[in-house]
């Protein structure tokens, strides 16, 4: 071993003593290859990138943020994907996207931490922006969303104007820049025809904390805890009863809420800016007077922030585009989370009993089967408090979405109803019915616009039942934010939420987790995202498509194809799934494509009994086979033999 090590050392000495040696030439070649690979990795991003310079808030110098021009980014993706190009062409046939009648752009932003959810580093948190278009059929698919900007949260917060300034610059570039959607439009060429597609901002989607940082709003803990209704005050403010026209977050009557108009919002921003100038520039008012202005208007002054950028005013209507996210309102330590815990506590349901119930052989939709079988972990020991009690429901949004219908069934069938328990049960059921309605609208089973009034009624009824049972002690700003959902439904006729944003985070995550160097971090992250997007576009399919490889159904039906799974209305249906068709149910036997249309070959069940308001019993193996159009099928939440 000594002789081998010595020989190796002598060889290395000869290499470094003789720079012209073959070995060193190989090292140079390796370095050259690394540079080539690095250039290739960044090539797509560099072709659409630009640099924005930001001043730091508390230190000298400037930060150069490398960003993708949104319009050029769309053009790049269209050039790399014929399938995406066809989607745009199909959308153009329905909506021309002219300057007078533009498309509607949806912009979402959120922060996330790369790494395991139980082992993450907050210093590596990144702020991501994504956009798509309302007119695209694939707007709920990740391939139809574009990521123009990623920035480390710590870096964004250290800039003058913070995240709000970053958002303002992005909006200006997106709509009013040299390639802006409102000024120039997207040039699209398809089958020899050339079009310019214009777009305006229709939806700005984030959670409450995102709007706090992105707009300069003082947030849910402020005197004005609702950015969409300016007559709503914090709970126990002692002002609502003394100020006519004002209510608190405990208000259950939507008719008493005043929806903030664009003029009113801009006036508030102007008042805040004027007060800030009078104090810091002219010293004409006291610090206490300034604080009172900020409290009463519910806004902070943010230099360069989106609410105080005069370039955007009258040209990019971001305020009326604000879209409250129902996922965070209900599922992220939200309204449904609280309601489920209150019902569990009231019924004295033990964690071990709930675990056993959730571990029964439930059949979930195929794509959710793995997660569904793990729902019992919500009540496992490591999610309980030190005494082994469920002091709160510790569950992710997707877990809670799968849990709530099973909890409702548990309380319906396993808990003895008593007069004392009735108010708790009524409140929980009313909350579940609100979520049921939102999910039906999200899946396209009902029209959000036509159902907006129903949503208002269900929200008001739930809040009244909750207050009748618990008082106002458990109410939080998210309860009053529910009222904002119906206003947006009437405007959009579409349900936008954070689930698509969470899915888009998965495109950033692989590059972010591998990142070791902090040099030009944003360039590296966006290069990885864009490369991944281009790769995924190569397998992009239609809004209804097979997931697996289809085969001929029969030699007698050569033009009929079948497969084991397909995507329909953003749902993944698999053979063996229990499906609904209006009031009927059945088992999916095959996914079928015939004559250019998709169907499900379904063995229909026979209705046996209605066990509860939300659970029915059916007789299976009837031999009654039907061919059902794909768009008429829906999934059950869970089934049991």
Name what the model sees in each region.
Residues 115-118, 139-141, 234-238, 330, ...:
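Short helix/loop capping segments that flank catalytic or ligand/cofactor-binding pockets
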Residues 106-108, 113, 130-132, 227, ...:
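Beta-strand cores of modular interaction/reader domains in eukaryotic scaffold and signaling proteins
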Residues 101-105, 125-129, 222, 497, ...:
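Core residues of folded domains in eukaryotic genome-function proteins
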Residues 78-99, 103, 112-162, 516, ...:
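Catalytic-core region of right-hand nucleic acid polymerases
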Residues 2, 28, 35, 55, ...:
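Terminal interaction-prone segments of large eukaryotic proteins
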Residues 107, 124, 167-168, 219, ...:
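Active-site-proximal structural scaffolding
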Residues 5, 9-107, 111, 176-409, ...:
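Charged (Asp/Glu and Lys/Arg) segments that form or flank catalytic channels of large polymer-
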Residues 122-186, 239-287, 291, 594-641:
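E2/UBC-UEV (E2-variant) core
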